């Protein structure tokens, strides 16, 4: 009986792990262990409940069902087979279950890079142990090549005149959905308006066509991407656990929004989902933002059409209308503002359609991408008609490559997937926009430069001002090297930036 119990337990683990791997792949694509751990440890408030139901229906219940059927079948055989044959069958089944479980564990490790994650956790990096740079005049200073990390607390940032900022995180918008002529992989461009905006304004690219930021450790899911763009640092899994225990989100970091708060900017975040999800409220409210308009507050403030709500919250078509009303209020004041918006319609696994979505592409997801492109373009046109536009810089950034795995199967393995970026009405120009290697961490200093700020040394965190002549950290040191180093432990970061207790 004990052997049967152990065998059934291992069988359950085996099948459950198999279904978990399949479920994660279908819903989130090729994620690594950092993303999984952060999601599990983060506050769950605001999570799409359909994901939880999907996990139960497609992973837990099938595994339990197979184990129950197997147990019943074993009982059936137990009554009909003699002792020797039954014993041999049990041993054979046990060997099969244990061996396949081991193979499953090895596969899971290779897929999520678990052993490497644990190995890196036990190693220490020195890329954050910076030395003080010699003081030089801003006009003469081009950066100290021996320093990789620059703590924004120590950096001088000045401006004679700076713009307002509208910063839009575009959910899952990557360049592969453009046509091949413009740097994507599609026969027909799913992002025609965003493509045109990128051509007419400033868009940094990893190729000689349109392109963008490389996916990078600690930046490839929404809250991680937001953190990287605000702090110039990748997000560590430990932050999720710290939020639960200490209610803190990188308290020692000086973010883009912390700096703008010091400059007197009014700062607001508008999202269609709930602000508590993954600690979004803590990241923004603890770092200079005055208020957050989320699903709960927006539905109390404004009237809306009932069809414009999805499983996460408000559809983007409704969110852009809310944004126009709030920007009209902000624009009527004498204060400079930073208005941040985050879209949701292109969220995995299938996106969310609205009444504005076309039906001209080959699948729903491509239609939603096209819809997003059109809506963003219309919103930008509306902004350009407002009195405050001449003093406002608009930044569009895809938060991470899409996780909707079923819609990206046609992407060649040789194609480098990158996220979209576009700087509109920048106060600074550059011709060095093609064949760049950069990550979301570079958005921090680059955004400030686009607004009209001068950054002493052109580096903040691990980010480099792309408008400067300096190479980014991955251009100088290589993507693989920096990718490995940021996964290692750092006492400097833990004590000074994350301030773990």
What do these predicted regions represent?
Residues 1-124:
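Transmembrane and membrane-interface helices of multi-pass
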Residues 35-36, 84, 137, 193, ...:
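Exposed alpha-helical structural elements
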């Amino acid at each position: 009986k004990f052997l049967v119990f152990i065998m059934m337990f291992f069988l359950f683990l085996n099948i459950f792990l198999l279904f978990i791997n399949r479920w994660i792949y279908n819903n989130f694509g090729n994620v690594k262990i950092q993303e999984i751990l952060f999601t599990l440890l983060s506050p769950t408030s605001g999570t799409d409940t359909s994901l939880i139901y999907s996990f139960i229906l497609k992973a837990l219940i099938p595994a339990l069902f197979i184990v129950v059927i197997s147990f019943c079948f074993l009982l059936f055989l137990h009554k009909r087979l003699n002792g020797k044959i039954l014993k041999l069958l049990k041993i054979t089944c046990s060997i099969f279950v244990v061996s396949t479980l081991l193979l499953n564990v090895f596969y899971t490790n290779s897929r999520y890079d678990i052993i490497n994650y644990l190995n890196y956790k036990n190693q220490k990096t020195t890329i954050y142990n910076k030395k003080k740079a010699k003081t030089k005049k801003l006009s003469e200073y081009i950066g100290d090549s021996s320093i990789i990390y620059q703590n924004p607390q120590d950096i001088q940032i000045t401006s004679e005149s700076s713009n307002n900022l509208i910063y839009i995180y575009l959910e899952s918008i990557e360049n592969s959905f453009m046509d091949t002529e413009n740097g994507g992989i599609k026969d027909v461009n799913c992002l025609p308006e965003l493509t045109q905006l990128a051509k007419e304004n400033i868009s940094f690219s990893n190729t000689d066509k349109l392109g963008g930021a490389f996916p990078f450790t600690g930046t490839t899911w929404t809250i991680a991407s937001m953190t990287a763009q605000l702090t110039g640092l990748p997000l560590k899994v430990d932050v999720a656990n710290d939020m639960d225990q200490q209610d803190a989100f990188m308290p020692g970091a000086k973010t883009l929004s912390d700096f703008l708060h010091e400059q007197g900017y009014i700062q607001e975040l508008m999202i269609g989902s709930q602000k508590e999800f993954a600690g979004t409220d803590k990241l923004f409210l603890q770092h200079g933002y005055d208020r957050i308009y989320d699903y709960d507050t927006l539905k109390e403030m404004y009237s809306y059409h009932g069809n414009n709500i999805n499983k996460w919250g408000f559809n983007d078509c409704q969110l852009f209308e809310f944004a126009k009303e709030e920007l009209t209020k902000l624009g009527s004041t004498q204060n400079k503002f930073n208005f941040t918006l985050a879209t949701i319609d292109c969220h995995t696994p299938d996106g969310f359609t609205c009444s504005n979505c076309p039906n001209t592409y080959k699948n729903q997801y491509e239609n939603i991408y096209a819809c997003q492109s059109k809506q963003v373009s219309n919103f930008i046109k509306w902004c350009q008609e407002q009195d405050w536009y001449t003093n406002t810089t608009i930044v569009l950034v895809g938060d991470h490559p899409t996780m909707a795995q079923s819609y990206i199967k046609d992407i060649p393995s040789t194609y480098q997937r990158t996220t979209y970026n576009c700087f509109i009405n920048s106060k600074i120009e550059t011709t060095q926009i093609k064949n760049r290697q950069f990550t979301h961490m570079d958005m921090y200093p680059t955004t400030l430069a686009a607004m009209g700020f001068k950054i002493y040394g052109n580096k903040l965190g691990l980010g480099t001002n792309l408008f400067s002549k300096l190479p980014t950290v991955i251009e100088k040191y290589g993507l693989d090297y920096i990718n490995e180093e940021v996964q290692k432990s750092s006492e400097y970061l833990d004590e000074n930036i994350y301030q773990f207790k």
